[in-house]
């Protein structure tokens, strides 16, 4: 849930293969304001507007925040699987309007493609330093916030790979 620049409340949601959707929420009742169907613009009266994904592409965990200074909405998503070979990661896209189109730093719209590494600005991913026994993996499902001093933080989960089994943690970067 988040508020746009005009104070309207929205919910962004979606998981794995279905895509990422956006619905407006009535601030007074907390109920969905169902949009009119508009197939040409990827709007379903029940699901809302499809922002990206679908077609069995591994994308989930969306989060949108508005940056007043730039006038952009930033859409964070998690791509990939919970694997140790470069899988789960956070990528970000931006738009001047709450309902998109959300594009990456090269102005590219994230197509329905398993090649998610070709889209978005990668913020987190797996890594293991050769000198360490532990590795970070499966970073994702983030939120973000800006503190009173204007510093932005990313909150996400990850797994630490130990010799015997993975451990789940939440981090703030």
Regions of interest found by a model, annotated:
Residues 1-164, 168, 173:
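Carbohydrate-active catalytic/glycan-binding domains of CAZyme proteins
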């Amino acid at each position: 849930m988040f508020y746009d620049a005009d104070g309207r409340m929205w919910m962004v949601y979606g998981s794995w293969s279905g895509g990422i959707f956006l619905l407006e929420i009535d601030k007074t009742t907390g109920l969905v304001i169902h949009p009119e169907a508009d197939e040409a613009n990827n709007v379903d009266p029940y699901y809302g507007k499809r922002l990206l994904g679908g077609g069995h592409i591994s994308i989930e965990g969306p989060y949108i925040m508005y940056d007043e200074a730039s006038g952009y909405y930033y859409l964070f998503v998690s791509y990939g699987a919970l694997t140790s070979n470069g899988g789960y990661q956070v990528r970000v896209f931006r738009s001047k309007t709450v309902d998109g189109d959300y594009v990456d730093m090269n102005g590219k719209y994230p197509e329905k493609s398993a090649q998610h590494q070709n889209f978005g600005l990668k913020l987190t991913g797996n890594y293991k330093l050769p000198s360490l026994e532990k590795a970070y993996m499966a970073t994702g499902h983030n939120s973000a916030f800006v503190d009173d001093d204007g510093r932005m933080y990313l909150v996400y989960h990850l797994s630490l790979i130990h010799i015997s089994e993975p451990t789940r943690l939440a981090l703030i970067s």
